[in-house]
């Protein structure tokens, strides 16, 4: 019953419930709701982010932030593009390992193959997270 809601339903304008609602968003894999659900689920799978020791990764593009988290059991890499433009970038100082993608703003064709440097791309405001088991680090 709408009369018992804490706040009134938005029934006019571009955000009205007839246009944007949870039931409809759940049907569309590319919806903002699914994006938030994916981020929340991935974040809960990797509690190291935010609490584990970390270091910034050296990147040749000022628009990209790279962070490396490390615990006794696994390592995590996160990259975020703070520019509205797509970027290609090179990151240095990443340990050689088999890295698995765990979160991204879209599907990317390139893979994280580590040597002394790593070359990747990100869409405008894009993000990519990778992880590896610590036993895989070389």
PLM segments and residue spans:
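Active-site beta-strand/loop signature of hydrolases that rely on acidic residues for catalysis
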Residues: 80-81, 125
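Beta-strand-rich binding/interaction modules
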Residues: 86-107
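Surface-exposed loop/edge segments in extracytoplasmic proteins
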Residues: 109-111
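Loop/helix patches that line or flank the sugar-binding groove of alpha-linked glycan CAZymes
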Residues: 1-76, 82-88, 93
């Amino acid at each position: 019953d709408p009369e018992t809601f804490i706040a009134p339903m938005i029934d006019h304008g571009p955000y009205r419930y007839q246009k944007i609602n949870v039931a409809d968003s759940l049907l569309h894999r590319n919806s903002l709701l699914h994006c938030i659900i994916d981020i929340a689920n991935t974040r809960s799978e990797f509690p190291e982010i935010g609490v584990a020791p970390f270091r910034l990764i050296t990147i040749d593009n000022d628009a990209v932030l790279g962070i490396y988290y490390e615990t006794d059991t696994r390592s995590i890499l996160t990259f975020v593009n703070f520019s509205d433009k797509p970027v290609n970038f090179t990151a240095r100082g990443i340990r050689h390992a088999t890295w698995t993608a765990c979160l991204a703003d879209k599907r990317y064709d390139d893979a994280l193959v580590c040597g002394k440097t790593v070359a990747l791309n990100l869409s405008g405001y894009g993000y990519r997270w990778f992880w590896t088991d610590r036993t895989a680090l070389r």
